[in-house]
Every structure is written in C-alpha cells, then in structure tokens.
C-alpha cells in the first residue's frame, strides 16, 4: 500500500471509532431530558433515578466522544493537507460554527447540569439538559452540513489565482439540500440507537430483577404466564421503574424507525440525482436498466462487473427507489464510467462495489434488530406486565449493538460510495470545484503514515476498551441507593475546617 491507501485507512478507522459514540450522544441527551421532564411533571422518584442512571451513561459516552472527536479535525492537516488547502476557506466555516456555537452550548450547560443538582431550581436545571440536547443536535447539523458540501458543493466559487474553492454564501452551504436530507436521517438513526440502548438495558434489568425476586420467593409464586402485574409492585420497585423506561424507548424506536424509512427514501432519491454512481454501486447495477430490480443476494467479484450475478431480487424496486416509478430507467456503473471519463478525463470513477453493496444492505438489515426488540418488548410489557422470560433478556442485550453497526455501515456507504472523490463534483454547479483523494492527500513517506495509523488505532482501541468497561460496570451496578430520593444533601458537619472540593455523580 502507498501513503494514499494508508491515509484512507487511518481516516476510516478513526472516523468509524468516533461515529460509534456520536449517535448515542445525539439520541441519549434528549431521552435523558425527557426522563427528567417526567420527574418534574409527575414528581415520581423512579423517573429521577432513571435520569441519574442513564445520565451517568450519557456522560461516559459524551466524554469518550469528545476524546475521539478531537483527533478528527487534526486529520485534515495531518494526512490531507492538499484537501485542507483546497477547501479550507469553505470547510472551516461550518466547523467553526460547530465549535463556537454548538460545542460551547452543550459543554457549558452540561457542566451546569452535572453540578446543578440541589443547587439550581428544578425548572432551571431541567432547562440545562434540554439545552445540552439542543447543542448536541446542533453540533450534528454543522458537521453534516460540512460533509454535505463534500458530497454536493454549493455556495462557493473557484479562484483560479489561488487554485482553491472560496466560500461566497454561507446560507447556501447551511441550506444545501443534501444536508437538509441527511440531517433528519442521521438524527432518526441516533434516536433509534439511543432508544435501543435504553430499551436493551431496561429489558435486561427487568428480567434480571424479576427472576431474582422469583428465586427469592419474596412475593410468592408468579402467575402462570411468567409475568408480574405492575400494579402488584411498590412504586420504588426497580422492575416497575425500568418498565417505564422500556415502554418509552419502544415507542421512540417505532417512531424513529418510521422516520428512518421516510428520510432514507428522500435521501436515496436525492443521491440518485446527485451521485448516480454511488447508488448504482449500491445495487451493483453494472448496466443501465429499465425497471431495475433490487437484489437481496448477489454473488461474484463485486469489483468486476462481468462476474456479478443477482440471485434473489425484487423486480423494479431500485427504479422505484430512484424515481417512484417501477418502470424508470436507472443508469449503470459502466455507462456512468464512460460519461465521467468524457466529462472529467481519464480515470477510474467506480467506488469499491463490494463495500458499497454490502454496507448499504447492512445499514438496512441491521435495523431489524431494533424493530424486533420494539415489537417483542411492547408485547411482553402489555397490560402492566413485567417479563421474566430469559429469551427476552438475551434479545434485549443482542439488539443493543445492531443500530450502532447500522449507523457505521451507513456512514461507510456514504463515504466509500463517493470515491474516488473527496469533494464530489456538483453536476449543475461550478465545474472546477472537485477533488479526488489522490489530489487531496499529503505528500508523506508511507512509513510515517503507517506509524501514525498504528498509533491512533491502538489509542482508539484503548479508548474503546475504556468506554465498554465503564458502560458495562455502571449498567451492572444499576441505579444507586442514594439516587432513590431527589435532592438529598449530606448533613452539615460541625467541623468548621474547610473541606477539599470534590465531585461525584
């Protein structure tokens, strides 16, 4: 491999590591805010305990997300200096807005939320977590706006004297139709991820506590159907508490899943228009077809169109996804390659067909894990029931990673499907604003890039291990006893000596 390949591997590995954490942060912040809102409205201590419990998990994820995200912006100057030189005037604007507006908003009010328990009025403290939720989603918008400019550049001109793109209209960049389509799709995926995370943990805790109570025989024999009515439990029972969180999450999962399908369809149709090569590669559609099918299973060497064989396919579905018409004509990879050679000169304009094809299907298929948990969860918790079936505990745990993997697959598809472009040409925009990966990479010795690849991969692996260890530890630990009742301050000491300031959440 040359320096270009290693640089791409490094950027891909660090981005996927970081993007595992991002959707959970985006979706979990408003869910924690909703839990705290329920506590403020109802006054039930169970919602307070849920807020503190899932708030702790949110803080762990947020901290590791910041740690892995800091390196991302430095990547552009490290291995992609030519890219930075070419688009710096444009790309820097949304990144600056993300840092100066969104990140400062979420960081400031997150600090107030952490230290504001028992110190701020209830409604003021509640407002801080909602502002955190707004901040993390605003941060996502600015990042997606920057990435969408790479997918579909608008609001810029090409300066022939400097040989780079220059921003002329920040509003056009922020209202780029690519960004407006991608943002709600990404947010829906984030809500699905967070809701599955909360539902999975809550489902596991419900079954764990129900089986524990059953074994200890503290409440007598359970009914024959293996569930305990919620009404039979005290209000502070952890089973009842986690059932409330699970039911809320199941509903969020269904709504987010529907939003994913709708926004995904909108974004897909836009990509057929703006990046037809990406969508043709997603289907391994080698030649132009009328009434193009959508394949569920394809075999062959996917980077060689001559060997691709579609074994199981749904007739006309790709055409429908492209233009809402089962008989529409969809351009194939070979024809688009010829078109791009005429328009942009000699070169290979085909992305990696194997990666784009399977990443697209993984993105869609893995969402089934969340759907299965939502449907099963609503059924086993119906009518106030609290499940103790072991299969539901396993389903809850196994469903948790599926939306994380689906989000990563979607991100890989989005980026790999754009190759070889790092700034894809806007076919109706400024012709000179385009850049391929080999034009954007830094001129570093391959050994230096390999060293940084190994270093960052090991560092991120260590951070990933810390992330998993902390989440696992505090999930198993569960809600703490001192969180059973809100706003309980420690007794005042008669000792007048000043104490060292400490923090514990």
Question: Where on the chain are the PLM-derived regions?
Answer:
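Polytopic transmembrane helical bundles with strong interfacial aromatic enrichment
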Residues: 1-505
